[in-house]
Amino acid sequence: MALKQYKPVTPSRRYMTTSDFSELSKVEPEKSLLEPLKKTGGRNHYGRVTMRHRGGGHKRKYRIIDFKRDKINIPAKVASIEYDPNRSARIALLVYADGEKRYILSPKGLHVGETVMSGAKAEIKVGNSLPLENIPLGTLVHNIEFEPGRGGKIAKSAGTYAQLMAKEGKYALLKMPSGELRRVRLSCMATIGVVGNEEHSNEVYGKAGKTRWLGRRPKVRGMVQNPVDHPMGGGEGRSKGHIPKSPWGTPAKGYKTRRGKKQSDKFIVRRRVK
């Protein structure tokens, strides 16, 4: 994957960069793995805004992704690499030996025509999914389970990965994308390799309209709002002296918002880097 740059024929094009989509197959999505996706506009079932700055955007269909990789010891051939509007990563269509089709996250280096497999006996190869106890130390992995059989939860965005650092008793020690060191059960599944589309974070949208296509609405700074709407609002002209806060009054810089006692604290060996 590479980034495509544009000639500055308009101000918005000057710094715009997009993916060249060269790694994608020229095929239509698999219909049996599509579902309707209703837009919420950031509202919950009461109609109240629970996620600000969401709304509009292009119509999408949801691609059903296999995060569990639970077809054990059945080889699958990569039929296509496809775009998914619902995530930053690309997805790969697998056709299993028994005829079933499934989408998975496409790791970097996976190509059409290759064969992948899940299970303890699978070889250490990009795209294969194995329990952590069968993966060598130092291997980069993604789509990692927190609980056996519940499906991958960690390292699923474009370009992300975790590194297997050690094995202690029933647990593996993983270095997370954030830098946190965390224990995960050795029986949890993980997929070999780094999630593809690693240049995604370097893309520049160039204009406000492109973010609107993605369903993002404008963010208004708290300082320019009224006192009734934001703790930092009001004042004559530009006023200072406020501690930076969220719209709900929580300090915005350096204030710890993680709950004091969480059940999962015992699995964290080293906290993430600030």
From Swiss-Prot:
Gene3D superfamilies in UniProt: 2.30.30.30, Nucleic acid-binding proteins (2.40.50.140), Ribosomal protein L2, domain 3 (4.10.950.10)
Protein name, entry field: Large ribosomal subunit protein uL2
Record note on quaternary structure: Part of the 50S ribosomal subunit. Forms a bridge to the 30S subunit in the 70S ribosome.
Free-text function comment from the UniProt entry: One of the primary rRNA binding proteins. Required for association of the 30S and 50S subunits to form the 70S ribosome, for tRNA binding and peptide bond formation. It has been suggested to have peptidyltransferase activity; this is somewhat controversial. Makes several contacts with the 16S rRNA in the 70S ribosome.
Region (Disordered): 223-274
Keyword Ligase appears in the UniProt entry: no
Keywords: Ribonucleoprotein, Ribosomal protein, RNA-binding, rRNA-binding
A GO CC term assigned to this protein in UniProt: large ribosomal subunit
Family: Belongs to the universal ribosomal protein uL2 family.
GO MF term list: rRNA binding; structural constituent of ribosome; transferase activity
One Pfam family linked to the record: Ribosomal_L2_C
PANTHER family: LARGE RIBOSOMAL SUBUNIT PROTEIN UL2M, RIBOSOMAL PROTEIN L2
Single biological process term from Gene Ontology: cytoplasmic translation
